[in-house]
Design a protein with these regions (language model features):
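Short, charged beta-turn/beta-strand-edge "cap" motif at the junction between a beta-strand
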Residues: 290-292
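N-terminal accessory scaffold of Fe(II)-dependent oxygenases
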Residues: 1-283, 295-382
Length: 382
């Protein structure tokens, strides 16, 4: 009897010790997570002292439901119809029924499914003051989104916007570029030289991207797998930049609080925005040069790409010849073989530049320095 009693006591003691060990492990994980979040928030936005200053966590609406953006059925539209009827006319739209066969529609549809592929992976959630990526473990990001003292409270929560996730994980096998956007002309510049052009986007309510124009004259498509996003869009040149981007308005949440209500007033003297609520399976097309701002209504997962096609080639080439001259020359050389029609357009632009340069600076040297190299692979945001 004594022996059995001793055994029973040892058994209970073992359970207690195991419970203590698990509790200590959890406390250690919690401390590690909190330290990581504190460090990451300071690096990503060193100028923000109070992340909950405006109390946006108590706001239930940003923008309005519904929309006035053109809607089209992607399943019944050919590439030529889209190119000539939509893209070349620079018409933004929301496209339905393009993603039904994407494995991502199931594999990315919840945090739990994503955790199967992204646990232990660091994801970009911002940039520091020197432009370097600020990264966070995916499991820490998930905990952050659900944390009442951080993600659930922050006015503009951290947001995964990462151009490397698709290539360094199996996620890239879960989707295909929709056929309407299959003309990817920048691939002829060489993958090692072209700027980042595809991003995985994951975030909770109030996160998003503030008002901007996509880089290098590119157009964009954004495919939403789960959740809801609200968009506002303005045509190029329709509203002064200082009106769209007033000082101190640096987040999507702040924009929808400060600028969006102004656009609804009768006193708004500029062109009214186009707007839409994007739902699961919807694809938004943003033409070259259009201003747009996007806020997440709830937990969202999306993939977005910037692209150059025949429809916006002239605009993109005009941009790249200035900002990435060496890449542009290699691109032009390759286009002479694969797309001689576009190469002629590009060469005309280059020739016109040279003539203008000769007229404006007849005595200047024609030599160039390697200091003007455009090898910088810094990230381009969308």
């Amino acid at each position: 009897m004594r022996d059995s009693t001793v055994v029973i006591r040892h058994h209970h003691g073992g359970k207690k010790n195991k419970g203590n060990r698990e509790r200590k492990k959890e406390e250690k994980r919690r401390r590690k997570y909190l330290q990581a979040v504190s460090k990451i928030k300071k690096k990503a936005r060193s100028n923000v002292k109070d992340w909950g200053l405006y109390g946006y966590c108590r706001m239930t609406e940003f923008g309005v439901e519904g929309g006035n953006l053109l809607e089209i059925d992607g399943s019944g539209m050919s590439f030529a119809e889209f190119s000539h009827g939509i893209e070349k006319r620079h018409v933004p739209c929301v496209i339905h029924n393009l993603l039904r066969h994407w494995p991502a529609m199931k594999r990315w549809a919840s945090v739990e499914r994503l955790m199967e592929q992204l646990k232990g992976v660091t994801c970009k959630v911002g940039s520091d003051d020197d432009g370097y990526a600020v990264r966070m473990l995916f499991e820490h990001f998930v905990a952050y989104m659900d944390d009442p003292e951080h993600g659930k409270k922050d006015d503009s929560p951290l947001y995964i916007f990462d151009s490397t996730l698709l290539d360094k994980t199996t996620l890239k096998h879960d989707y295909l570029v929709p056929y309407l956007f299959s003309e990817d002309l920048l691939k002829y510049a060489g993958e090692e030289r072209r700027p980042p052009h595809q991003w995985m986007c994951i975030g909770g309510p109030r996160s998003g991207t503030s008002i901007h124009v996509d880089p290098l004259g590119t157009s964009a498509w954004n495919a939403l797998v789960c959740g809801h996003k609200r968009w506002a869009l303005f045509p190029p040149g329709s509203v002064p930049e200082e009106v769209l981007k007033p000082k101190g308005v640096n987040s999507a949440a702040r924009w929808f609080d400060v600028v969006w209500p102004q656009t609804l007033e009768d006193s708004w003297k500029y062109e009214k925005p186009l707007y839409v609520e994007q739902g699961p399976g919807d694809v938004i097309f943003v033409p070259s040069g259009w201003w747009h701002v996007v806020i997440n209504v709830d937990f969202t997962v999306a993939v977005t790409e910037n692209f150059c096609s025949s429809a916006n080639f002239h605009r993109v080439f005009m941009h790249t010849r200035i900002s990435r001259p060496k890449m542009t020359q290699k691109w032009l050389d390759r286009l002479k073989t694969v797309r001689p029609d576009l190469a002629r357009i590009g060469q005309q632009i280059m020739d016109n530049d040279e003539r203008c340069s000769d007229i404006s600076s007849p005595s200047s040297s024609s030599s160039s320095s390697d200091d003007d190299d455009d090898d910088d692979d810094s990230s381009v945001s969308s």
